[in-house]
């Protein structure tokens, strides 16, 4: 009898322990619309929200100290000076992330979307790469490989929605005339070379005087192109390429270096307004690039360790609308799509379990490996 009693006590203790485990990590925190939100996806949304807050931390705030940082105040809008307590900001951003995930999956299904086998393979590959790079950190935050696979699928669905909503056969198609106007008026098509401000053999960096001398030589080459701009993107590219090839030996010689055999090979970029600002972060350079007319060349300080020689071209003279369609559509409509997704997600019925979410508070986030 005594043995049976002990066995019963042990069984009860085991049952209580199992219940405790299930309560500490719920399988799901509920639904938004008809989309189930597993605990792993909730934890990923919360972790991402925390990282967004961490990016807004001031120099004297340490986001690796989670408990204290959650109590801190951050500036969330430099233009208006709006501030927020980190814990409130993380909670709001977590909800917005979940609403976005649910909206993407719902809209994708509504429009008859189906991921291709290649897209699913790509999602799995990206998820595995993330786990290989930061697996310990993800695992410490309760985020497993299956969650990352689902998240990567959501990202691909979001990309597909751009075409499904605004593409040629989309729900609200953008006309070729609208795309053409956007390409010509709002985007900048360039061919360019990046010139390092250091000796590529010794890695000795240019001082201020040497950097200024190299930039002046590059600008002189650009001005020689602008003195007689030929007609057509092909001729403009050829003239620019010749000017670059002629100028590079003297530019590299400032640092006792020589250009490699492919140093004058031109790269191509199509930049939207946000891309231009991000690409040309040195003061005044983004505006200088925007001000160029098709066929005009320039040389600008690209970063603290490189300058860029570039020529702006008419995108539809240098390329075709079909080949530029995806980039132009993304630049034109990505912001609108994101706003509509966020609004759609906020309007979906919410059946989230606050008790379940409280079992996974932001205070348990691990923000260092």
Predicted regions: what they are:
Residues 1-12:
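Positively charged n-region of N-terminal signal peptides that target proteins for export
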Residues 16-20:
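C-terminal motif of bacterial Sec signal peptides marking the signal peptidase cleavage site
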Residues 23-143:
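N-terminal targeting/tethering segments
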Residues 23-25, 32, 138-216, 276-369:
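PPIase-associated folding chaperone regions across multiple families
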Residues 47-54, 95-116, 125-139, 143, ...:
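Sec-exported extracytoplasmic/periplasmic mature domains
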Residues 61-78, 201-223, 320-322:
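A solvent-exposed, charged loop/short amphipathic helix patch at secondary-structure junctions
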Residues 92-124, 161, 260, 269-273, ...:
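Extended amphipathic secondary-structure runs
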Residues 220-282:
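Peptidyl-prolyl cis-trans isomerase
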């Amino acid at each position: 009898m005594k043995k049976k009693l002990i066995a019963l006590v042990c069984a009860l203790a085991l049952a209580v322990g199992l219940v405790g485990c299930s309560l500490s990590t719920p399988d799901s925190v509920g639904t938004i619309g008809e989309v189930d939100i597993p605990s792993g996806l909730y934890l990923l949304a919360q972790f991402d929200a925390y990282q967004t807050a961490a990016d807004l931390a001031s120099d004297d705030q340490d986001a690796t100290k989670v408990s204290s940082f959650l109590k801190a105040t951050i500036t969330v809008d430099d233009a208006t000076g709006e501030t927020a307590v980190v814990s409130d900001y993380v909670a709001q951003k977590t909800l917005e992330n979940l609403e976005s995930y649910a909206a993407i999956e719902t809209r994708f299904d509504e429009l008859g979307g189906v991921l291709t086998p290649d897209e699913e393979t790509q999602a799995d590959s990206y998820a595995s790469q993330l786990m290989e790079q930061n697996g310990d950190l993800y695992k410490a935050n309760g985020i497993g490989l299956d969650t990352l696979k689902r998240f990567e699928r959501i990202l691909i669905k979001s990309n597909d929605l751009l075409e499904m909503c605004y593409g040629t056969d989309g729900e609200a198609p953008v006309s070729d005339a609208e795309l053409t106007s956007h390409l010509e008026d709002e985007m900048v098509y360039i061919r360019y070379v990046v010139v390092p401000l250091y000796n590529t053999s010794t890695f000795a960096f240019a001082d201020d005087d040497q950097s200024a001398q190299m930039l002046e030589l590059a600008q002189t080459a650009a001005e020689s192109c602008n003195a007689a701009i030929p007609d057509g993107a092909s001729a403009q590219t050829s003239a620019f390429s010749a000017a670059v090839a002629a100028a590079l030996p003297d530019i590299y010689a400032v640092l006792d270096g020589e250009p490699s055999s492919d140093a004058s090979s031109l790269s191509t970029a199509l930049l939207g307004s946000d891309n231009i600002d991000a690409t040309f972060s040195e003061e005044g350079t983004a505006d200088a690039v925007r001000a160029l007319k098709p066929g005009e060349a320039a040389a600008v300080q690209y970063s603290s360790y490189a300058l860029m020689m570039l020529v702006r071209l008419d995108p539809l003279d240098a390329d075709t609308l079909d080949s530029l369609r995806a980039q132009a559509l993304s630049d034109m409509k990505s912001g609108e799509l994101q706003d509509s997704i966020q609004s759609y997600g906020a309007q979906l019925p919410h059946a989230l379990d606050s008790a379940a979410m409280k079992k996974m508070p932001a205070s348990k986030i691990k923000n260092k490996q």
